[in-house]
């Protein structure tokens, strides 16, 4: 089985899952080529699992304009069984090559179907995304195959690395600093919780605004901006609570990653978490934008060790039962082998 991926993402949960899947497929004997942007920090994580070719994805770059022709020529030469595009914009560049099964993998809600004119099958990582694709009028094949993450526990980072007292309650969140991630709401929540520290991993266009908000609310001494981290697991293992504060989150890989490290989760009632989280059982859920609600939920977990343990254990059970590496990899292998 030979698969050629084209993935033009930058850094984030979708990219971490891409790395996980490429490695899992390689372990099961799939020969892979990955076309990615230059300079990706996660390139080294797939170097042993796939041949890597780099291509620019800027809208007006010559590489982007020529990419469909390059992929088609490469496909004729190397004869992959499957071409797999990750996300709508990569799907738009899918060549009209008849010799391979053409798959588009979606981790978010598409706005139109014209991206997928040369796609045979759309893989959606939640039922909600699949429903959107169907509602838009898609008549070809749809599969729902979700994500997985590594479940191995790691050694927690020393809190002193982020200038945080060893005995302080610590809350963490991570992702690109954009408005929809809701980090401003989380900072407002922490301002209501004296003594609680907040670690934010990531970066982005809202960075300066978030720094200013922390200063304006008088909590800059308790908020740590840690930037992008190659491995977030030691940080997840070191904190008391992980908070997913997004107003829009199709799945929520960060929740799965938190459960893998035994960390309880508080999440907004956004799309993905509402699918697999059960309020009060495997996590606590809060309305979008409700800083006071986040503060109450965080305080509950910090103050109640038995609740913290129970939420973490039930979360890990959900991870293993619904998002296992073996089951997700099996589902992809079954799909890849179903080439018409």
From Swiss-Prot:
The gene is lpsE. GO terms for molecular function: glycosyltransferase activity. Its EC number is 2.4.-.-. Keywords: Glycosyltransferase, Lipopolysaccharide biosynthesis, Transferase. Gene3D superfamilies: Glycogen Phosphorylase B. SUPFAM superfamilies: UDP-Glycosyltransferase/glycogen phosphorylase. Pathway: Bacterial outer membrane biogenesis; LPS core biosynthesis. Belongs to the glycosyltransferase group 1 family. Glycosyltransferase 4 subfamily. It comes from Rhizobium meliloti (strain 1021). One of its GO terms (biological process) is lipopolysaccharide core region biosynthetic process. This is Lipopolysaccharide core biosynthesis glycosyltransferase LpsE. Pfam families: Glyco_transf_4, Glycos_transf_1.
